[in-house]
């Protein structure tokens, strides 16, 4: 695993982090405010900075004392309710958005360590796990062995899922585009509110960062011939090879594939279904449907939850910014 530590931007990010309680298992920054993206947001020098903080109780109670004004009306219900909303609704993450901090506009999501580990290993929501399949800047990380192991496994699972949706031979860009798109499969925001060229806009300017993130996994994988200098890869597309890959997919994705393929009344076990899928010429399409079955409901629940966690006014402003970004992308493509 090669999650990227801070470089020149480290001091600015750490200054922002100093405004929050210190008890963080992991803090990372992501998005167009951190990594250059092609497309309509490429010229935004002061793009909003996106953060995710991985925490344990009683983080919200401490943050409410320091940053009361960051929260919506839910703050009057207290930290216990906020934590319950965070863990039990949407994708397990609580976002405060459109916050001014150290002269920058920021958005930060808060997720519990245990919920993140579950998502990284099993892809229950593929929400924050999906963010961590793309290049991010690690601002802080403790020595939690279980979390570090789960971060590594999430990257390996992303590679395996992408392999199943690719042909026998493909390029690095093909692979990284599939990986970057995993957590957008079925995401309704890609229809309303997001620039539809978003995945390519993420990958093309950041090929070196993707290589840094996935290079060692590809070099060590027995499933692929990786010609790094040529930027090309070859994988085993035999039913046996695909079955091996399907059996190592995260549990929730396996269950969704089983649900899609299992006829009513059959009640086959997951392994039997995956063996059938391995022999199916449309194996990659089935995997894609399984991903969409995870992402679609979790993205919708999380966006609905955002109305309450951000408050109605901020939700309207934030949605307007997203729609403006989508419009700029459409104008750019048609001009």
UniProtKB/Swiss-Prot annotation:
Keyword terms of this UniProt record = Lipid biosynthesis, Lipid metabolism, Magnesium, Membrane, Mitochondrion, Mitochondrion inner membrane, Nucleotidyltransferase, Phospholipid biosynthesis, Phospholipid metabolism, Transferase, Transit peptide
Enzyme class comes to transferase
Gene Ontology CC, one term: mitochondrion
Membrane topology term: Peripheral membrane protein
Q: Which Gene Ontology terms describe the biological processes this protein takes part in?
A: cardiolipin biosynthetic process; CDP-diacylglycerol biosynthetic process
Is-annotated flag, keyword Cell cycle?
no
Q: Which coenzyme or cofactor does it need? A: Mg(2+)
UniProt keyword annotation of ATP-binding present = no
The pathway where this protein functions is: Phospholipid metabolism; CDP-diacylglycerol biosynthesis; CDP-diacylglycerol from sn-glycerol 3-phosphate: step 3/3
Predominant location: mitochondrion
Protein EC: 2.7.7.41
Q: Where in the cell is it found?
A: Mitochondrion inner membrane
| Highest taxon in the source lineage | Eukaryota
Record-linked Pfam families: Tam41_Mmp37
Provide a Gene Ontology MF annotation, just one: phosphatidate cytidylyltransferase activity
Q: Which reaction is recorded as catalysed by this protein?
A: a 1,2-diacyl-sn-glycero-3-phosphate + CTP + H(+) = a CDP-1,2-diacyl-sn-glycerol + diphosphate
What role does it play? Catalyzes the conversion of phosphatidic acid (PA) to CDP-diacylglycerol (CDP-DAG), an essential intermediate in the synthesis of phosphatidylglycerol, cardiolipin and phosphatidylinositol.
**Would you identify the family this protein belongs to, as annotated?**
Belongs to the TAM41 family.
PANTHER family the record matches? PHOSPHATIDATE CYTIDYLYLTRANSFERASE, MITOCHONDRIAL
What name appears for this protein in its UniProt entry? Phosphatidate cytidylyltransferase, mitochondrial
What is the phylogenetic placement of the source species in the record?
Eukaryota, Metazoa, Chordata, Craniata, Vertebrata
Gene this protein is translated from = TAMM41
């Amino acid at each position: 695993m090669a999650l990227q530590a801070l470089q020149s931007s480290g001091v600015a990010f750490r200054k922002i982090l100093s405004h929050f309680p210190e008890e963080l298992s992991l803090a990372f920054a992501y998005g167009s405010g951190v990594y250059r993206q092609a497309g309509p947001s490429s010229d935004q020098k002061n793009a909003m900075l996106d953060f995710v903080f991985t925490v344990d109780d009683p983080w919200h109670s401490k943050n409410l004392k320091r940053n009361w004004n960051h929260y919506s009306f839910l703050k009057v219900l207290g930290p216990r309710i906020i934590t319950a909303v965070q863990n039990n609704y949407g994708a397990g993450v609580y976002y405060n958005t459109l916050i001014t901090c150290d002269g920058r506009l920021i958005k930060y999501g808060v997720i519990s360590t245990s919920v993140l580990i579950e998502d990284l290993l099993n892809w229950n929501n593929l929400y924050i796990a999906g963010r961590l399949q793309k290049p991010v800047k690690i601002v802080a990380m403790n020595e939690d062995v279980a979390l570090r192991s789960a971060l590594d496994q999430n990257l390996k699972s992303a590679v395996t899922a992408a392999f199943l949706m690719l042909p026998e031979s493909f390029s690095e860009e093909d692979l990284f585009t599939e990986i970057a798109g995993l957590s957008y499969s079925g995401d309704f925001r890609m229809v309303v509110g997001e620039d539809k060229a978003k995945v390519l806009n993420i990958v093309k300017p950041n090929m070196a960062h993707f290589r840094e993130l996935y290079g060692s996994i590809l070099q060590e994988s027995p499933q692929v011939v990786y010609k790094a200098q040529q930027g090309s890869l070859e994988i085993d597309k035999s039913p046996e090879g695909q079955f091996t890959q399907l059996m190592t997919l995260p549990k929730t994705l396996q269950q969704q594939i089983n649900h899609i393929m299992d006829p009513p009344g059959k009640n086959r076990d997951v392994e039997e279904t995956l063996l059938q899928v391995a022999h199916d010429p449309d194996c990659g399409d089935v995997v894609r449907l399984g991903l969409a079955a995870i992402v679609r409901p979790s993205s919708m629940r999380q966006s609905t939850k955002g109305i309450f966690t951000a408050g109605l006014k901020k939700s309207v402003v934030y949605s307007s910014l997203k729609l403006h970004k989508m419009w700029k992308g459409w104008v750019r493509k048609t001009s």
